[in-house]
């Protein structure tokens, strides 16, 4: 059930040109913009890999169209984890797993954040459990990798610009390779 690096590249090449639902970019453009923003901010390879892969779960289901418009939470932040676990460690996987909760956290703690979300992101927020209450926000904040998940979330929110210039997918494969677990390298 795991993917190899060539499988991941192939998935982006075959399914990445699908529209990122409710946004003016494709899935691949969104992934590349997220990784580019992480790289520009000096993130390490594990977090750049997380930024590239955080929405891979959207490419691994067959719901079709825009799941949020169908009232569905596609659980993309969890859907991709079994496919990536053999390759990457927690420094990559945990920010992916937590990036949806990071949105819920920021809505609770940062004035104006909720209102600044795109329409589809606001719709998905409700399907994903809504804004954290104070106790949930505090519990999230205490988690390992919560800060990285918040950084990823901010790049995710920003990486929706039509016609933005980024390096191509091949450029980011080196970050994927650098983020591999030692056991994945040996395999």
Where are these regions (language model features)?
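Short Gly/charged-rich anion-binding patches and loops
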Residues: 7, 33, 79
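Metal-dependent nucleotide-binding catalytic modules
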Residues: 6, 25, 122-187
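Divalent metal-dependent catalytic cores for phosphoryl transfer on phosphate-bearing substrates
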Residues: 37-154
């Amino acid at each position: 059930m795991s993917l190899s690096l060539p499988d991941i590249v192939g998935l982006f090449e075959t399914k990445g040109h699908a529209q990122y639902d409710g946004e003016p970019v494709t899935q691949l453009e969104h992934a590349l913009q997220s990784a580019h923003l992480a790289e520009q901010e000096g993130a390490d390879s594990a977090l750049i890999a997380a930024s590239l892969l955080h929405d891979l779960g959207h490419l691994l289901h067959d719901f079709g169209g825009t799941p949020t418009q169908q009232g569905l939470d596609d659980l993309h932040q969890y859907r991709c984890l079994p496919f990536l676990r053999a390759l990457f460690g927690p420094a990559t996987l945990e920010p992916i797993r937590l990036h949806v909760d990071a949105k819920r956290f920021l809505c609770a703690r940062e004035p104006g954040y909720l209102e600044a979300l795109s329409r589809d992101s606001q719709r998905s927020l409700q399907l994903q459990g809504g804004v954290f209450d104070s106790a949930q926000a505090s519990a999230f904040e205490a988690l390992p990798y919560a800060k990285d998940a918040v950084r990823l979330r901010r790049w995710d929110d920003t990486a929706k610009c039509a016609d933005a210039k980024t390096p191509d997918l091949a450029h980011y494969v080196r970050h994927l390779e650098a983020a591999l677990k030692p056991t994945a390298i040996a395999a």
